[in-house]
């Protein structure tokens, strides 16, 4: 197989150029890549086409690059199928199917959401005991205490900063 490459704008001209060189078994045009893949039935015709395309340009003057690539990149000559590793035979045919219908009389129940409680019960009780208690231990470092005032003149909660 030969791969002809030019700019994507000149792919149609490249395809016509490839068709005129020698009889082609089939071609594939890759517009976005600016490539034409051409396959030939005869190796001698393929080699002749490679020599003819060495001029390096289309009739419009656009550069053309031609490369020879193997038709089957996985084929290695000299190794038969008997010498290569074979896929093992299937012992069982595994069938993955959806689950069956629910049993007769089954009714769906409404379940509680998974995170209905944010904290464990014992931790929540201890926090409720603390309430708005102010810890007066100033030796532990700086503290920030936020509390609400019942004063109607102040609309935002006051903040106490202690050092």
Curated annotation (Swiss-Prot):
GO aspect biological process, one term: calcium-mediated signaling
A cellular-component GO term for this protein: nucleus
Compositional bias annotation for Polar residues: 153-163
GO terms for MF: calcium-dependent protein serine/threonine phosphatase regulator activity
Pfam families on file: Calcipressin (PF04847)
Region (Disordered): 142-163
Membrane-crossing residue ranges in chain numbering: none
Chain's role: Inhibits calcineurin-dependent transcriptional responses by binding to the catalytic domain of calcineurin.
Protein name, as recorded: Uncharacterized protein C13G6.15c
Source organism per UniProt: Schizosaccharomyces pombe (strain 972 / ATCC 24843)
């Amino acid at each position: 197989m030969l791969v002809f490459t030019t700019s994507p704008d000149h792919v149609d001209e490249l395809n016509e150029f490839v068709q005129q060189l020698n009889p082609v078994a089939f071609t594939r045009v890759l517009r976005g890549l600016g490539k034409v893949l051409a396959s030939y039935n005869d190796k001698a015709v393929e080699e002749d086409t490679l020599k003819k395309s060495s001029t390096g340009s289309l009739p419009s003057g656009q550069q053309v690059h031609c490369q020879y690539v193997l038709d089957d990149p996985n084929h290695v000559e000299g190794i038969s199928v008997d010498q290569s590793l074979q896929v093992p035979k299937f012992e069982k045919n595994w069938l993955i199917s959806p689950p069956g219908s629910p049993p007769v009389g089954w009714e769906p129940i409404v379940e509680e959401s998974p995170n209905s409680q944010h904290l464990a019960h014992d931790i929540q009780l201890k926090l409720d005991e603390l309430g708005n208690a102010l810890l007066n231990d100033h030796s532990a470092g700086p503290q920030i205490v936020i509390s609400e005032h019942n004063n109607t003149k102040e609309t935002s909660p006051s903040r106490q900063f202690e050092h």
